[in-house]
Each structure stands twice: as C-alpha cells, then as structure tokens.
Amino acid sequence: MRGGSSDAERRQRWGRLFEELDSNKDGRVDVHELRQGLARLGRGDPDRAQQGVSSDWDADPDGGLSLEEFTRYLQEREQRLLLMFHSLDRNQDGHIDVSEIQQSFRALGISISLEQAEKILHSMDRDGTMTIDWQEWRDHFLLHSLENVEDVLYFWKHSTVLDIGECLTVPDEFSQEEKLTGMWWKQLVAGAVAGAVSRTGTAPLDRLKVFMQVHASKSNRLNILGGLRNMIQEGGVLSLWRGNGINVLKIAPESAIKFMAYEQIKRAIRGQQETLHVQERFVAGSLAGATAQTIIYPMEVLKTRLTLRRTGQYKGLLDCAKRILEREGPRAFYRGYLPNVLGIIPYAGIDLAVYETLKNRWLQQYSHESANPGILVLLGCGTISSTCGQIASYPLALVRTRMQAQASIEGGPQVSMVGLLRHILSQEGVWGLYRGIAPNFMKVIPAVSISYVVYENMKQALGVTSR
C-alpha cells in the first residue's frame, strides 16, 4: 500500500483511533460516542459518517461497534480510499496537486477556479507542500462522510422534487449503484407522487394561468381576482380543478419515457467517456424531452381543452378525445406541437445554465467547508433556475396554449405559430406574450415547497436511503 504502512502499524493506528472514540472505555463504540468523537475530530457530518460505519459492520447499531468490527470497517475503507486516490492521481506520482483536482471536477462537469482548487487542497494538506500524499488523503477521508468526489454532484443533483408544472428540464442523473439497487425507480415514483400532490395543490393557479393566456387581451383586461371570480361563478369552486386529472395522469408516462430516452441518448453521446459535460447533458436532455413530448403530446392538448371547458361541455376525458377526433381530425392532437418543442431549448438550456452557474458560484465560495449546500440553498437555486427558464420560454408556451385551444374558441382564427405571434405582437405588444405569467410565478414557491415535503416523505416510505 502506498505510504509504506505495515499491517501492524495500521492496526496500531486503528486501535488508537478506537480508544479516542471509546470515551467510556467499555470496549465498544456506540452511536453517541461515534457522533461525539467525529464532531470532536472534525471528520465531516457525524450523522452520515456514523450511518455509514454502523450500517456496514454492526447488526445491532444500539450495541455499538467492537474493536474487531471497527478494524474490519477501516480495512475495507482504506482499500476504497486507495482506489479513489489512484483515480485522482492522474500522473501516478504519489501526490494529488491543484491541476489534478481541477481536472477531476472538470470531468464531472464542474468548472472550479484555481483559487477554489487551492482551498480544497489546503483543507487536506498538513505539511504545506501544496500537494496531497496518500497519508493526508487517508487521514482526511477515513471517517469522512464523502465517499468520492462525485458526492459533490450528488448534493447538487437537479432533483425531480422541484415540480412546478412544466416537464421541460434536463432529467436527473442516477449513479450506477442507484440503478443496480433499484433506487432509481423508487426516486422516480417519489418524484411522480410529489408532482401529483404539488400540481393538485396549485391547480387553481394553473387553470387561471391557462384561462388568462387564452382569454386575456387589451379589450378583456382579465386580472387574477377577476379570473378566479369568473371561473367560480361559471362552475363553482370545484371548477378551479378542471384539467388537473389529466395533468397528474401524464406525469408517470412522461417521466418514464424521458428517463429511458435520456439514458439511451447519453449512451450514444458518451461513447467511451466516463461522464458527460454540461453541454452534452443539455443536448441529451433536450432530445429526451422532445421524445417524451412527441409521444404524450395528445395528453397536453386534452389537458388544455379540459382546463378551458365550460360546465357540461364534455362528459369526461374520453368524451373530449372522441369529440376532438370526430370534429377536427387526428392532426388536432398535435396543434401547437412546434412551439412546444422549440420551447424545450430555451427552458432546459437556461434552467441548466443558471443552475450550473449558481452551483459553481457556491462551490467557489463555500465548498472548502462542506460539499453539502443544505436544502435551502438547493431549493433556492432550483427555484431561481426554473423561473429563469420559464421567463425565457413563456412566449412559446403561450402560443402553444392558444393553438391548442383554437378550436374551443368559437369563431377563433386557425393560424400558424408565426401568424399567431405576429397577431399578438401587433394587437397587444410584447406584454401580450406574457399574459398569465403572474399566477404562474405565484404557484412556484408553493409548488416547490409541497413537492419537497411530499418527495422526502415518499422517499422515506419507499426506503430510499440518502447518502
């Protein structure tokens, strides 16, 4: 092993560490001693490190770890750390320097500055050589909560928890371990349930947005309170949830199709590469989103028609589909498809770019202390990036909605995407392309909050472990 430690020396070192942690000297290290010891030694997050140690080697966590169990864990741990050290030591000179740290992050799609790489190195460099040798690496990570450099990406994974009613974002990344253990589908299910609850909770604002996109104009100055009042007067309070059923129903097929398409497209783009760069993720995510939208798009048209329906206009989902087919033909199910697909590029691109920018800014400022930014930072960055994506793609979303609703407006002109854009700009100006954006923004915070709470509870119910 690099570093020249004999087996006897390693066991002596492990024994000394065990004695440090065993504060009551009963020959076992229990959960409380482990937590207190890790906090005292400054070895990362005590909760997560303690979970990793006890889950690996002790059948009875309450009983604590014996010296033998603790030694077995550290032996296996050092072997994994040595493999990680070798993978980061690109030139195999026995030391990790600043440039190798930058290369490792770059391979994961994260761009960090020289100053930030030096901060990371300083946190482990005890002898002031501006490099990290095996002993420094081992001692820093032996009981540290991070398994590898990719844990930084785990914390920053753009999660399905942020469901704000639009499915145009780049899909989530799942590790090989998550795929092999089946955690990936549990996380997708948790995300789908969270999305369903979130969309149901914010359905009145979503219906108001669609209502204002289609009906608001210079001559019909529809505001938020006026729109809600009109809908309640026409169909009662429950009418505020019209169209929500199919909006929830389409979550599962769209998420599944997008995930499968993303994995296949990633494989084709990646080739022999280990990881995808941010630009490649954007291309793969956009193509996967376009694939999913192409397949489920008839459900989008049905959602718009059902959302805008008058009381008694349709008996239900199947009746709506039947009437559209009979009166307008199969092409009606793809009305507005072009602006919808074109909207994926600005939405997913800006969403991903803003998220990566915020992530890199956080890493440059704070990651020398911890790779985990905390849930408030994650939710804040996700909300800001999604909102920026929405602003950029909103005019196309409005044109799409109006085209989907064309046949449901009596005497409404059947115009193309370009024709509709020209009509809106000439009659209402640029602001006309942003009708309904106020209720759209109003639903972002409650949607994100609801989906996060439900997502975390669903993960717990399904047995999804957090690293």
UniProtKB/Swiss-Prot annotation:
A single MF term (Gene Ontology): ATP:phosphate antiporter activity
Spans annotated as Regulatory N-terminal domain: 1-148
Short name of any one Pfam family annotated for the protein: Mito_carr
First and last residues of every Solcar repeat: 182-268, 276-361, 373-461
An example Gene Ontology biological process: regulation of cellular hyperosmotic salinity response
Annotated region described as Linker region, given as residue ranges: 149-158
Keyword Transport: yes
Protein activity control: Activated by an increase in cytosolic calcium levels that induce a conformational change of the N-terminal regulatory domain, uncapping the channel and allowing transport.
Gene Ontology CC annotations of this record: mitochondrial inner membrane; mitochondrion
Places the protein is found: Mitochondrion inner membrane
Positions contributing to Ca(2+) 2 binding: D89, N91, D93, H95, E100
Membrane topology according to the record: Multi-pass membrane protein
Span list, region C-terminal transmembrane transporter domain: 164-467
InterPro entries associated with the record: EF-hand-dom_pair (IPR011992), EF_Hand_1_Ca_BS (IPR018247), EF_hand_dom (IPR002048), Mit_carrier (IPR002067), Mitochondrial_sb/sol_carrier (IPR018108), Mt_carrier_dom_sf (IPR023395)
Record key words, sorted: Antiport, Calcium, Membrane, Metal-binding, Mitochondrion, Mitochondrion inner membrane, Repeat, Transmembrane, Transmembrane helix, Transport
Primary location group: mitochondrion
The protein's assembly and partners: Interacts with MCU. Interacts with MICU1.
Entry domain remark: The regulatory N-terminal domain/NTD, binds calcium in the mitochondrial intermembrane space and regulates the antiporter activity of the transmembrane domain/TMD. In absence of calcium, the apo form of the N-terminal domain is intrinsically disordered and binds to the transmembrane domain, inhibiting the transporter activity. Binding of calcium leads to a major conformational change and abolishes the interaction with the transmembrane domain and the inhibition of the transporter activity.
Family per similarity comment: Belongs to the mitochondrial carrier (TC 2.A.29) family.
Function in brief: Electroneutral antiporter that mediates the transport of adenine nucleotides through the inner mitochondrial membrane. Originally identified as an ATP-magnesium/inorganic phosphate antiporter, it also acts as a broad specificity adenyl nucleotide antiporter. By regulating the mitochondrial matrix adenine nucleotide pool could adapt to changing cellular energetic demands and indirectly regulate adenine nucleotide-dependent metabolic pathways. Also acts as a regulator of mitochondrial calcium uptake and can probably transport trace amounts of other divalent metal cations in complex with ATP.
Annotated protein name in UniProt: Mitochondrial adenyl nucleotide antiporter SLC25A23
Lineage of producing organism: Eukaryota, Metazoa, Chordata, Craniata, Vertebrata
